[in-house]
Structure formats: C-alpha cells, structure tokens
Amino acid sequence: MRKERQNNTKNIKEKKNYKKAPLMPIHLRVFMAVVLGQIACGFALGISGTALSNASKYITINDLWTGLIGAGSLIGLAGSILIGRLSDKIGRRKLLMLNMYILGILSLMQLLTNNLPTLFIIRVLIGLMIAVDYTVGNALLTEWLPKGEDSKKQSHLLIYWTIGFIASYLTGTFINGFGSHTWQIILATGAIPAFIAAIFRSIFPLPASPSWLASHGKVKTANKVIKKHMGRKWGIPKRLKKAKPVKEVSWTILFSGKYLRRTLVGGLFYACQAFAFFGISIFLPILLQSMQLTDQKISGIIYNGGMLIGVILGILLFNRISRRAFLISNFLLSGILIGFLAITKNLNSNIQLTIFCIFAIILSSGLVLDYPYPTELFDIKVRGTGVGTCITISRFGAAAGTFLLPILTNQGGASLSMLICAIVLLAAFIICLIWAPETSPKFKQNN
C-alpha cells in the first residue's frame, strides 16, 4: 500500500507544467470565447457615438448629455477595480459565463427609453459588463494559454476588439429609415454580438483557471481541471504546488513600495491613451464635421481603416521591440502629429485627412499593449486586482476624453479638442520615459 502511494506521488511529481504544453483544443476554445467577447465589447463601446449623432436630429440633447451618455459605458468600465477583486476572490469562470447575456439584455433595453438619465444608467451598466471581459477575460486567457502564446494571443485580441469597434461605426453610419427610433435601434444592435458570445460560452463552457485554483490552495481541483481538458501528463507547476494559499488582497498593496511604480505606470499610460483614443473615435462624426472635411462619411471610414492598419502594425512590432520603447515612441509620435494638426491653420483637406489617418495608425498601434502590458506588470497574487485597478484608472481618462470632446469642439472647434489630446499624449510620453519598466521576457534578458 505504501509503495503504491509512493508511485502515485512520483507520478504527480512527474506531471509536466501545463503552461509548457503545445496549443490544444482547450486553448483555442478559451481564446475564441474571449475573442467573441472582445468583438462585443468593441461594438458596445463604439456604437454610442453614431447613435447620439443621429439622435440629435430627433430629440433635444445638449453637449452635457451627449458627453455623459457617450462616456457612460466608459464610466461603467471604471468598475474594473471591483470586478478584478471579485475575480481574485471567486474565480474567473462564473463572471464570464454570465456577463455577455446581461450585456445583450441591457443593449435591448435601450429600445425602450429615450429618457436621457435612464439611458445614461443603462450605458454605465453596459460598461460594467464590458469590464468583466476586459479584466477577467484577460486573466483567464493568460492563465490558460502556454507560456509565450499568452502575451502573443493577448496582443492579437486588439484586432478583434477593433473589428467590433469599426463594425459599430459602419452599423451606425448605414442604418437609417426608422425615423425617430433610428438612434435607439442603432444602440440596440450591440445585443447581437453580445448574445453570439454568450451562446458560444454556453455551448462550449469555459473552464476554471488552474493557476487561480492552485493559488487558493486547491491544487487537487486544479489538476483535475487540467487532466479533464489536457490529459494525464500535464499538471500544476511545482512553484504553485508549494505556494501558500493567497490571502485576500488589499487594494493598498498596489500602492506599496513593491507595486506603486507599476500601478501608476499601468494606470496613467492607459488613461492618457484612452483619453485621446476614445474621445476622438467615439465622437468622430462631430470632430469630422468641425474639421470641415468634404465627405465626412468616407473620411470616417478612412480613419477607422487607419485604426485597423495600426493594430495590425502594432502586432507586427509587438515582439520585435521592447515594451518600453514601444510606449515611449508611440506617445511621442502621436502627440506630435495631433498637435501639428491642432496648431496648423488652413491646411488642404486631403493633407489634413492624411495626417489624421497617420495619427490613427500610430495611436492605434499602441493599443496592442493595453492587454499584455498591465497583465505583465503584476504577479498572479494581485493580477486581477492590479489589472482591474489599471483599467479603472484608464477609464477615468477615457470617460474624461469622451465627455469633454463634444464640449471642447463646440466651444473651440476641432483645433481645441486636438490640442488637448496632444498635451495628454505628450504627458504620457514623459511619464513612460521616466517610469515605464521593461516587461518583455525577450528584452529583459538582454538588459
């Protein structure tokens, strides 16, 4: 009997680290579930700009409410700090199995009201559901995918998020013919990608995170999950077997000496980038009108095309240059370009559009760092809370940009809006130049 126990112990010890396995069907299932969620999130965030531009034809909506409703989902995303803590406490799977259904229902509820305060509340709740995928989806993905594939696949998520975001712009631009209900129908189309993601997750249920289970002292359960999805020879790595169960993490630890710099960099780079990106992208129709470009619909499509090119370019650059160099150069170049547009008067419209498109390409290429970089800044003990905190800080930037852009454009035209964006981006350049740590395994080894 003792010999049999020794053999069993030996077999357990000989299990290979599941993070070193080749890509398997379970990895692709988790990745696809997160991809569909990213498409739904990008769509739900982007749809408000074109819907509100359409709404102004039928209802009285001032700059304040335009900014608030446009920023509503981004304000809701500030709940990422709560979602991150909740996922560190109860795990990743439960939240991801429910949030897309709730997102779909909330999107449909926008058909039932044109009351602006009610609509604002719904948009905030939509943002809270998006926060689940932003925070928990990324944590589950990085905890399941093989080492090396995790950060690479995370950087690819931005392609799918951008596809959802661009699809929302095209949907809002080309839906018409429903009279005074057109803008509500545009908003409600966010239910379609949300329910597609929800149904996929129900048909192909998401697994629990083995790393999270082991870090909470549930090593046997973690190994059972791995065995079920990957086979007998894979298991939890030794370092997680020996790790003490994680105690509840206090938010204050993120502002202690060990994590303070990482928390500030992760939150502030994200906030400055989001200020410019969401402010411009969500209210692109308003900005293009103020820029007095001849064909605003085509100009908008070109700008959005630049965004997609930028994300693809970012993915190509992602593992070829260091994270730190990527951040610094991205903020510097995008800040100079949008600043040049802001201070230059009477430029030919084609030159304006060309510079604006190059700006879109450069700024969007930096979005590729939004998922892997904050995740890499924190270890597994505080990852959910840390990433959630960074996303929360970033959403203040995103909400501020989205809230302020219609007001700034109305007060001082496109030039004022672009000048403020330039100042924020150049501030991010200085922050990253001074504080940003290198997190890329490839370039850390070379230093």
Protein language model features and the residues they cover:
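Transmembrane-helix signature of 12-pass secondary carriers
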Residues: R2-N447
